[in-house]
Amino acid sequence: MSTPTRGFFGRNRGGRDPRLPPGQYDVGSDFPVLTAEVTPSIEPASWTMTIDGLVESPRTWSWDELHALPPSRFEGDIHCVTTWSKLATSFEGVSLDTLLVETRPLAGATHLVATSTTGYTTNLPLEHVRDGRAWVVWTHEGHPLPREHGGPARLLVPHLYFWKSAKWVTRITLLDHDEPGFWERNGYHDLGDPWREQRYQGD
């Protein structure tokens, strides 16, 4: 008796995986490398993470201090604006909720800007990084995050297009207004919801 191959499991009748947002395709085991700048080489011992702006207690964590916080794991899907999706993948780090509890956002804080060591920036509404929706991560599939994918640590906001998950993140600044980042100033959507195909301004 023949046995179905792996590729025939979990397909819906329409032939499209329901985990894929409109216009996306499953990249399988690949993890494409896309970046807006030269990939930096950052030693974990010299890396820090700062949360400042509209918070009661601005804070900077060292690599060891961040690792001493309760770990948090994400298992799910990520979606790139260039139309690839990576399904059933995993990252581990610390929930942004944990960092916000320590820094205590002020009542007027509505948005944030994430900044990378390269100077890359991206903006996010504060509500989109709370309640278990965002992380600072340093492992992927159980291995240290490669530098081409943002290592030693990157922001992870998996429910939005992946340019919002800033590589080599080193600072998150809370604001009382929206302040577009690098790609947002160059025509990309301010939010970037893949299920609404918010790739570009006006989408």
Predicted feature locations:
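Structured, non-membrane catalytic/scaffold regions adjacent to prosthetic-group chemistry
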Residues: 2-203
